[in-house]
Amino acid sequence: MRQVLSNHPIDHRFFFGNNGIRQGNPGMSDRQSNITGNRMLVIGASSGIGKALAIAANARGARVALAARRIDLLSTLAEQLDGSAHELDVSDPQAIESVVADVAARFGGLDAIVFTSAAVPFALIEDTDVTTWLHTYAVNAVGASHVLRAALPHMADNAVALVASSHDVGRPRAGVAAYHASKAALDEILRSWRAEHPELPVIRVSIGPTEGTEILRGADRDLLADLYRVWAQEGQIPAEMSAVEDVANALLSFIAVARANPTVVSDIVHLAPRTGSKQV
């Protein structure tokens, strides 16, 4: 890696995360946090927030089905959680329809669907080719919408859909143009879902910097070093990062609250790291 960061030592949590994931709190039984027995499909469950959420949901008594591209990782996790694993590329509409229908048939319906999949290509905007743009939109924006479309006929009364977005929408960083633009498109698509289906609680969660994800997996380290320097100059390096298991449990609580209070929905939620917080 080129030495371009002499004044800004690299925080390796930001680059590589923390692969350890704490179990969720299985003792939660209050009506506002209870998800026991909920039939839940978690898309993007092979790593990061999706994986942590699946683990926490299982610990809190939910029945989970897991979907992601990396079926080898998914199968191991599903076995641990007594759930089912489904290979899924969310840029493939037919695959989405097949997986959602299969899970709904196994469960007899869906109480919650969670979408955490994301494509995050790191490249300067002039180096981002059309194929990359189209794939990123297909995963992050169109894929999420098609999941909702496929799930709609199978959603039980008072079912909830939760979709992970990014707190960087409207404040883009250098080197992540396709990701930021696709997440902005996702936000507008979800607004349209709420406008056309006000009966369906669609919770859009803007998630800030989080430890324990694989957002930088496969990225060019030399490019990241240069980008890190630019982000530092622009004040875009987070002083703190949220723990992935805390984010996961917060997301599950949003689902529980929406199901416990059917006349309201947390339409837009922002999750940001708490500065100076200490893990208990």
Each model region followed by its residue ranges:
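Conserved glycine-rich Rossmann-like NAD(P)H-binding loop of the short-chain dehydrogenase/reductase
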Residues: 60-75
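Conserved NAD(P)H cofactor-binding loop of Rossmann-fold oxidoreductase domains
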Residues: 116-121
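Catalytic loop of short-chain dehydrogenase/reductase
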Residues: 160-185, 190-198, 208-213
